Structure formats: C-alpha cells, structure tokens
Amino acid sequence: MLYIGIDLGTSAVKLLLMDSQGNICNIVSREYPLYFPHPGWSEQNPQDWYEQTMEGIRELLKDADKNQVAGISFGGQMHGLVILDEKDQVIRPAILWNDGRTTEECDYLNNVIGKDKLSEYTANISFTGFTAPKILWVKKNEPENFARIKKIMLPKDYIAYRLTGVHCTDVSDASGMLLFDVKNRCWSCLLYTSPSP
C-alpha cells in the first residue's frame, strides 16, 4: 500500500509518497505565484494550486503502481479565504493568511463582539490573518462577490474538495476561521447574531 501526503504551502505544494512501513518513496515540490495587488495584500489563484497539485501527483506517481495508493492526507497554509459560488466555482483570488488588509474588520470583531467573547467561543481573538475578517472585508468592499458566496473554504480544503468532491475541513483549521465554537465543536452563530460593521 502507498500513501500520499499533500502540503499546500504559501509558495509551493509539497507532495510525499510513502509505503505502509513509513519509507519515503518519492518527494515532489511544485511552485506557484503569489500576487500582491496592493501594499499589504497577498493573494493566490486557487486554480494554480490545483494545477500544480495535479502535476505534482503525476510526477510523484510516475514510477509507482497507482493502484496501490490507499489514502491521501492534506495539510497546508491556514486561514486563507477561498469563496465559491453556487456552482462551486471560485469567485475571486484567495486572500491569504499573510494578507494585512483587514485591520478595520479585526478592530470591529475585537471591540464590538469583544476579545473575551471571541476567545470564549473560538479560542482566539481576531488577527488580520484569520478568515472571518476577510469575509467581512469582502462584504464591505466587494458586495457583488459577497452576494455570490455559497461556500467558504480554506486553501487545503479547496484542494481536498477538487480531488475528492467533498466539502470539509478539520477542527484545527476551523478554529482559525473565527467561525467555529471550539468548546462545542460546531459552527458558531456569534458573527451571525452580531451587528454588521
């Protein structure tokens, strides 16, 4: 049996092929561009992630028996905002973890909702890297894109969806979105019940 590990990083996707004894059979890295459309902004095209991941998988398995692949594991950059429309198409470039445009939205979350309340529910306070401030930024600055949102995903979850057809995330990444009630392990209505900025 063989297993694939996919790490969707900020500058490249790293892929590893391992056998059932934990021996590394192959390692591949594929780079993709990072865009800075304005000072302090950081974006990527999710299609670039997908294309380089697929190329990486082909390269990773070129000398392996593909029928022996028993599982795939996903990891990668956290907190980036990938928004999809009703047809699961990407609406705009992903806003990454290292993007600093959401200072006002973070101030709103920390001051109006409150750091204590945020911390109680999400085990975090709001920072510019997290997902919820990015959603609020899109709502305020790109209302036409906000109106089209049907699904919100994180970068590695988008790649997992493209490879499996399943929309999902994990508790660790969900907690950094500021949308997840960590204590009760469910999505929080905290932002939905608070006044909008």
Identify what each model region corresponds to.
Residues N67-V69, D116-S126, N145-M153:
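A short alpha-helix-loop-beta-strand transition element characteristic
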Residues L61-W97, I125-G129, A160-D181:
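Short beta-strand-loop/turn "lid" adjacent to the catalytic site in phosphate-handling enzymes
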Residues Y192-P197:
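Conserved small/polar residues in nucleotide/adenosyl-binding loops
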